């Protein structure tokens, strides 16, 4: 008999989790594709360090703001906005690459903007989960989210190499853009979510975890 994790028996969390599973794999695909892309653009090792800087600085700057907003505004709506923004940025990266207009500045700029979006998305996501499952299933829900993140970190790099070899660099970014639709569709399908404004339930600490699932 197949055991279904308790959190996945709740429809709205199930939608979100499967959407995140797809999206996180797409984000990891893009991350490793960017590393490879930079290697093809320059032989300077420091250029790779620039990606890390572009990913972490915006989160340090905006994480507390993102946490405060997640405590007061509609978290589902925040995620709809941030996920759409992340998809559009990935699409821009794909288009610039396909048109041959890509360079290090564009890569850093888009990476930084995606990190800004993640600084608002991550705390909203953490705060949304308690509205989707009862308190008794919260530990299981957060464990499943960690599993989704780690699965993406394993699957993403392998898929990225395969797509680059078979289709080209720009298609990795395009696939990532499409992967965000999985979360957007999940958020739409779950409908309105009742939530209480509970100041202090989301902290900057949750937002400062970008390298796990940064889109």
Predicted regions and their residues:
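Alpha-helical transmembrane-bundle signature of multi-pass membrane transport and export proteins
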Residues: 1-215
């Amino acid at each position: 008999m197949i055991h279904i994790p308790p959190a996945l028996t709740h429809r709205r969390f199930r939608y979100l989790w499967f959407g995140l599973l797809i999206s996180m794999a797409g984000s990891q695909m893009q991350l490793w594709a960017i590393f490879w892309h930079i290697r093809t653009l320059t032989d300077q090792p420091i250029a790779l360090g620039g990606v890390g800087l572009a990913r972490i600085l915006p989160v340090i700057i905006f994480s507390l703001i993102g946490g405060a907003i997640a405590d007061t505004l509609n978290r589902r709506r925040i995620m709809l906005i941030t996920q759409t923004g992340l998809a559009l940025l990935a699409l821009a990266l794909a288009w610039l690459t396909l048109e041959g207009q890509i360079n290090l500045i564009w890569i850093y700029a888009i990476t930084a903007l995606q990190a800004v979006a993640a600084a608002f998305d991550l705390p909203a996501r953490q705060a949304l989960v308690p509205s989707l499952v009862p308190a008794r299933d919260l530990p299981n829900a957060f464990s499943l989210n960690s599993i989704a993140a780690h699965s993406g970190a394993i699957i993403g790099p392998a898929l990225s190499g395969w797509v680059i070899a078979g289709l080209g660099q720009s298609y990795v970014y395009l696939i990532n853009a499409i992967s965000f639709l999985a979360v957007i569709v999940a958020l739409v399908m779950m409908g309105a979510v009742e939530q209480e404004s509970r100041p202090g339930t989301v902290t900057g600490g949750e937002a400062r975890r970008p390298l796990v699932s940064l889109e």
